[in-house]
Amino acid sequence: MATINQLVRKPRRSKVTKSNSAALKACPQKRGVCTRVYTTTPKKPNSALRKVARVRLTNGFEVTSYIGGEGHNLQEHSVILIRGGRVKDLPGVRFHTVRGALDCAGVSDRRQARSKYGTKRPKG
């Protein structure tokens, strides 16, 4: 236990919590340009070809972003919007691509959870 005199000389410092998505710099979303669009395999015990994109953000950061949903139209030089949110079985992927914003098209023929995939309401 510190004495009052010690605390007067050197007060207690509060712990600084580290952000899980530092590249966003306290913004809800960030715009960026795809530098590479590719597939990668998840950690054990899962097996798939997950679609990801390497993105150069407007603030200079280069991050990896997951592309959710079935099928996408992204390629190199596509301008996309990313949000926070990691993918548990892909190490180093801490961002999600926002579907239906900028150059990234929404998922076609999506019926449920449409707002998460940028899909308009179907007719009928």
UniProtKB/Swiss-Prot annotation:
One of its GO terms (cellular component) is small ribosomal subunit. GO terms for biological process: translation. GO terms for molecular function: rRNA binding; structural constituent of ribosome; tRNA binding. The modification 3-methylthioaspartic acid is found at residue 89. Residues 1-23 are annotated as: Disordered. Pfam families: Ribosom_S12_S23. InterPro entries: NA-bd_OB-fold, Ribosomal_uS12, Ribosomal_uS12_bac. Keywords: Methylation, Ribonucleoprotein, Ribosomal protein, RNA-binding, rRNA-binding, tRNA-binding. Belongs to the universal ribosomal protein uS12 family. With S4 and S5 plays an important role in translational accuracy. Interacts with and stabilizes bases of the 16S rRNA that are involved in tRNA selection in the A site and with the mRNA backbone. Located at the interface of the 30S and 50S subunits, it traverses the body of the 30S subunit contacting proteins on the other side and probably holding the rRNA structure together. The combined cluster of proteins S8, S12 and S17 appears to hold together the shoulder and platform of the 30S subunit. Part of the 30S ribosomal subunit. Contacts proteins S8 and S17. May interact with IF1 in the 30S initiation complex. This is Small ribosomal subunit protein uS12. It comes from Pseudoalteromonas translucida (strain TAC 125).
